[in-house]
């Protein structure tokens, strides 16, 4: 397989105007992807293959959308332009409209200066590695154009948001509603700025929306799932029962209760799993290396299988598919319920939590019941480039000693940062003081 140069774990991403996130590269990428899709799907039923393009609210989305559209059309692919919609909406539209692929223009939780391009398969799932490799290889081919009679056409969808709103609502039980529930919805000035408030209002909730005034530059700025403290303030000020925070492309969720307490992805995943267990058996759940130790212990107590994947929703999904499990997620709020959707979806995940609370008729804190999140201590230690920390004898000895000290009362995670020259030393333990002292022992071994 060709080594991937441009595609990371979540498509192509970078700073606007940089090596890959620019108009010229987007044109080439659209043409390369179109060539691959035409080879795979061309000639079926005598019609041209179709793809859908959705985007978030960054100012650069217009430029990248136009360039991708031109490249795809030059390769003989018809293009549906969905406009600003959440990433999971593109996955849904791709599958529902029987398209050959979906394309998302978004850098998720990053600031507006960044953007990205990622693909969904015809099944509404992340594009397989081998197809991404084919597209990478096609990027090295000369930019061309099919004959005029075979050129693709583009048109704007008029009902993309409405279709997705109805799909989200369909994942909430028909015998329940949100009448009488006061909810603050924070859409991070991102892709869900219009659809998210509509979903919860149409189910009966009294909704106050914040983060719904995108200007091309304010996406994720002090609002959304990365800044749930803004939501917590709004919930307390409004006297709301709950708050729902999404990130820029609405595939990430954090929630807040009426007291302003913030709940992360581990706690929300537990809420969903517990509700599903009230209706039947849950075979297993996939978390990540960062999933709290308390979540793992609670899964063990409930007799539910638990596996840790590498950090990244792509890896969570791979583990879920390998084991045939339906539920998985990350502490950051990427939550996947394969009995509802083919990808992580912040709005749908929130609806599953609300299902649990309406069925149980209890506040979120009470629904979490016996779940005890373990205190965490993280220390970042500078790491010189090229350092082989895995072979460091002092760190290895300290790790063994700390793990013996914890002995079922916590865990140790040591990993190099993917973005900075640092080694991250993380300890979770029953008590904050124990977590701190163990982390400091690990750090001291590297001094």
UniProtKB/Swiss-Prot annotation:
**Which ranges form a coiled coil?**
none
- EC number of this enzyme: 5.4.2.10
Q: What is the UniProt remark on how the cofactor binds and its stoichiometry?
A: Binds 1 Mg(2+) ion per subunit.
Cofactor(s) needed by this chain: Mg(2+)
Modification(s) after translation: Activated by phosphorylation.
Which InterPro entries does the entry link to?
A: A-D-PHexomutase_a/b/a-I, A-D-PHexomutase_a/b/a-I/II/III, A-D-PHexomutase_a/b/a-II, A-D-PHexomutase_a/b/a-III, A-D-PHexomutase_C, A-D-PHexomutase_C_sf, A-D-PHexomutase_CS, Alpha-D-phosphohexomutase_SF
Phosphoserine PTM sites in chain numbering:
108
Q: Where does Mg(2+) bind?
A: 108, 247, 249, 251
Q: Which Gene Ontology BP terms does the record give? A: carbohydrate metabolic process; peptidoglycan biosynthetic process; UDP-N-acetylglucosamine biosynthetic process
GO terms for cellular component: cytosol
Q: Which NCBIfam families match?
A: glmM, PRK10887.1
Q: What does this protein do?
A: Catalyzes the conversion of glucosamine-6-phosphate to glucosamine-1-phosphate.
**Family recorded in the similarity comment:** Belongs to the phosphohexose mutase family.
What protein name does the entry list?
Answer: Phosphoglucosamine mutase
